[in-house]
Every structure is written in C-alpha cells, then in structure tokens.
C-alpha cells in the first residue's frame, strides 16, 4: 500500500530554538519518514535569533517565494495532510495566517502544531479575533501540554486538540563529577525573559548568606550582552560565584551537566511552552527549579522532580537552592525521579510515536 503523502511546513535550524529543533527531529525521523511519504518546506524566514520578529524587504520577498513554493508543491504532490508549525500572535501570525488560508483555499486538510503561545493575549482585538476565527475553523491542533489549551479555548473545541509533549534523543548518562561547592546551571539563550537577572539576584542572596555556590550561565548572548553581564557580576562582587561561558554545544555542554547539582531556569519568556533544556537536565538526573510558565508544570512534578516557583521570585529561588544544598539525599532523589519521568515520557522515541499516531488519526478522520 502506498504511504499517505504529508507536506510538512515547519521551522528548521538555523536559528536554533525549541521549535526548529523539534522540526529537525521530525525531518530526520525514520519512524515518520517510513510511515508516510514526507515532503518538507522550511517556514523560517529568520536567519538568527536576533532576526526573529523583525520585518524587512528581504523577508517579504522570501515569504512571497514561500507562498509560490507551497502552491506548486500542493499541485505536484497532492498531499493527504498538511502539517504547519505556526506562530500564535503578532506579525509572524499574520504571515502564517496567509499560509494556512492558502492551504484551505487549495482544499487541504490542515493540522497545526504549536510551539509557542499568545492567542489569548490578542483575542480581544477586533482584527485578531476575526482572523483567529477564520484561522482555526476546521483545524486540528497539536499542543505540547494540557496547560496550554486555555490559550486557544475560545476558538478550538477540545475534541479537535491532540496533546503531544516534546521528546529528545537519549544520550549517554554522564558520570557525575564531584565538586566542593554546590553547582547550579542555567542553560539557555541569555535573554532577560529567561530569568537571568532573577537567578543572578538569587546568587547574590546566597553569597550574602555565605553559601558555597558556583553558578554557571551557559548560552548564546542575546538581549543581555556579555559586557553588561560581566559588569553586573563585578558590581555584585560575584566573580568567585558566578561564571558566564557563552554558547556551548555537544561535548562542551555535557561537561557542565556533569558538574551540576541543580538546574535552574526561572523563565517568564512570553513564548515559553515546553523548554527542551528541562528535558536535557532531567535526562542527566538533575533536580529542576523553574516557573509556572506555559507547559512547564507538566514537565516538573513539584516537590518530586524539582520545584515550580512563581515568576520574578529570586528570594524563593535562593530558598529552594539552599534547601537542596542542605538536603543532598533529597536533591539526589529528585534527580532520580526526574530521570525516570524523562525515560517514561520525554524521549524522542516516545515523541515520534505520538506524532505518527496523531497524523495517522488525522488522515483517517479527515
């Protein structure tokens, strides 16, 4: 029997972010490519992280070419299903609205897979409300977590929603490298909304209490610049406590995971949905401290695999870190529970199986 044809219109690296990494996992998946006759088109117009959300003539021209390419692909391959990873709000949504409308005009079955959020923040605007009604009509939607349904509840019935948590490849379980101090790791782009300053303030609190910590910030410089961050470390007299390493990948990143006692990610990023960095930390048996942003409460089990805290709460971050320092056995147990949860729910194999089943169901019920 001939495999059903699917056109995947998704984000691929560069730039590297959660949605593009998941796009790459789908693109490279033997399970998905062997199950379906897959065709791929890269939806990304941004060349790097700083380019995300910006306009310009180049992007306009590239988008026009994209629409033409989509139209030609639909006519030539005649897919049974189209899969799109759209943006939820703003100018990027208006662009993706046109993509989905083109697919609908061409009588395609469409499923959208959200890696961001923000519909609910714009649904009271007249234009956006009208466009959302048109956009979501007769659409199936994949969400990363039950927690994210509230974002689209106004427009989508729950029966048209699939829940599919992200997954990442299983890596070798790295041996722990014992350290004298309690080591904390932040692993993400160096953006204010990722909670960088909140963690730095927590480090300041712990330093004033005489706690022997080392906090490592690993990630690409973004709206927080290196000089700015170093100046802040110096101002707070944290040069022996806090270290900035820039972006690290592969084995270089693994070195930090090996030396870490607790992973802290106090994000309040407005597009945060299901951060892959938490899965990486859980895979390595690290207790995680993060916020109630997006789908994070469905990743971390509060007080079992780590802690869910309020956003903008450096004092609470400091308290949780101090507790883990003073209760090493509980710290280790949380890490073990996190790794078990990762292996049960968040591996790439589990993700691929979920996506395959969802797409098969969509084609059957179309």
Listing of model-derived features with the role each one plays in the protein:
Residues 302-303, 307-314, 323-329:
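Conserved acidic donor-binding segment of nucleotide-sugar-dependent glycosyltransferases
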Residues 228-248:
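Nucleotide-activated donor-binding/catalytic signature segment of Leloir-type glycosyltransferases, i.e.
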Residues 316, 323, 330-345, 351-354:
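A short, well-ordered alpha-helix in the C-terminal region of glycosyltransferases
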Residues 283, 287-290:
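Short hydrophobic beta-strand element within catalytic cores of glycosyltransferases
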